[in-house]
Each structure stands twice: as C-alpha cells, then as structure tokens.
C-alpha cells in the first residue's frame, strides 16, 4: 500500500511539473506572439516562393511545414483571451478570406480551393456555433465542415480544422488533465498535417514548431506587441498578389 501511494505521489508530481512547464512553454507575451508570427510569415513566404516559382527546393518546402502550426497556436492563444469567440472578429476573417481568394487564384492556386484564411474562419465559426449548444447551430457547424472539406485541399483540409480546434481548446483548458491530453493531441495532429506529403514533411512540421516555440519562450518576454491587429491577413493577401504578378 505504501509503495502504491508513493508511486501515485510521484506520478502526480511529474504531471504537475509537466503542466507547469507546459504553461510556461506555450503562454507568451504580446511581443513573443509577434515574434512567432514573424517566423511563421518567413516560413510561409519561403514555401510560397518555392511553390509558385516551381523552384523545387526541398529545404524550402520542409521549412514551410512549420508555418501553419505556429499561426494556429498564436491564433488559439489570442482567441482564448476572450470569454467567448466574437462574431465580428469571425466576420473580419470571412471578409479577408474573400479578398485574399483573388490573390490566391492570381498566385496560381485553383479557384475552387479555399485559402488558409478560410480555414481560420471556418474553425472559428464552427467553434462558436458549438459553444452555444444549440441543435440547429451544431447542425450548421457540421454542414459547414462538410462543405469546407472538398474545398480545402491546399489548406490542410479537416486536419487543419482539428489543429486549430486543439490549439484553441488547449488555451481554454481549465484543469491539468485536460491540458496534458490536449498536448498529446497537439503532438499527434501537427505531424498529421503533412503526413500525406511525406514522412520528412511530417517530422519537419513538428521540429520547426517545437524549435521555434522553444527558442521564443526563452526570450522576448518583456517585448511589446509590434504588429498591428490585421497585419497577418493584409500581408497574406498582398504577398500572394505580388508573387502572382511576378510569376506571370
């Protein structure tokens, strides 16, 4: 009995230390969030240059696998700061997605494939509808995901929605067990985003994410925010338009 109690105490202590480490590792100051977004932007641009100009550089492709998970984590943290997801913020995402779609097509992507801003909009809309616990809104959320699925081939598909949902729930979790379970889900879903491309892409996405988060968590804690609120969607649409024009 004493041995069992000792083992239980040790397990609880390990779980507590892991939870404390997790919170220090994944909760960032406004400046740290902007650093992570900047790294993600650089990785995204490298990936898009490689794809749009057909450079076929493996290192650029692999580096780009870290962009979406980093954006997703920052998005989840930002969203969790409010008691409820705000519909006006979701509406802005829908609007920017529509604007960016023209640049997405100009950059050479199929017109019927939704850009990544739509993935964020769909995820936020589904989450807010599910939080209301209304039957018709739950049905609407399921319908929205079903409609998005065939249109999301270049934006991580349903796995991308899962990544966004897990990122949000991780920061909303109120107890240790839920946080640790969601961490396990996160470590599984990040490689799953790129598993269809190759094993190397799956590993690269996880490595780039963990490496970036680890380095940023150790520095910049007192750095204030330096990007304006809508910088990412504006930059996303503009960089696609510029690359699309240059590739003509």
Swiss-Prot record:
Residues spanning the membrane: 39-55, 180-196, 200-216, 232-248
Membrane topology, as annotated: Multi-pass membrane protein
Pfam families registered for this protein in UniProt: TraX (PF05857)
Cellular component GO terms, alphabetical: plasma membrane
Superkingdom field: Bacteria
Family named by the database record: Belongs to the TraX family.
Function text: Responsible for the N-terminal acetylation of F pilin.
Name of this protein: Protein TraX
Gene name for this UniProt entry: traX
């Amino acid at each position: 009995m004493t041995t069992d109690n000792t083992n239980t105490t040790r397990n609880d202590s390990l779980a507590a230390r892991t939870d404390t480490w997790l919170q220090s590792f994944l909760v960032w100051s406004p400046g740290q969030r902007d650093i992570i977004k900047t790294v993600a932007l650089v990785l995204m641009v490298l990936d898009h240059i490689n794809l749009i100009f057909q450079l076929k550089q493996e290192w650029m492709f692999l580096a780009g696998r870290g962009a979406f998970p980093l954006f997703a984590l920052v998005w989840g943290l930002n969203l969790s700061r409010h008691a409820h997801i705000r519909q006006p913020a979701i509406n802005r995402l829908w609007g920017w997605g529509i604007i960016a779609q023209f640049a997405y097509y100009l950059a050479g992507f199929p017109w019927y494939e939704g850009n990544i801003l739509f993935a964020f909009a769909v995820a936020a809309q589904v989450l807010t509808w599910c939080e209301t616990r209304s039957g018709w809104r739950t049905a609407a959320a399921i319908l929205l995901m079903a409609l998005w699925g065939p249109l999301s081939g270049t934006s991580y598909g349903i796995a991308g929605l899962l990544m966004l949902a897990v990122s949000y729930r991780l920061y909303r979790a109120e107890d240790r067990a839920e946080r640790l379970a969601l961490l396990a889900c996160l470590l599984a879903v990040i490689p799953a985003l790129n598993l269809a491309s190759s094993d190397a892409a799956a590993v690269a996405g996880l490595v780039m994410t963990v490496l970036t988060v680890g380095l940023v968590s150790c520095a910049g804690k007192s750095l204030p925010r330096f990007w304006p609120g809508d910088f990412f969607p504006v930059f996303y649409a503009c960089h696609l338009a510029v690359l699309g024009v240059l590739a003509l």
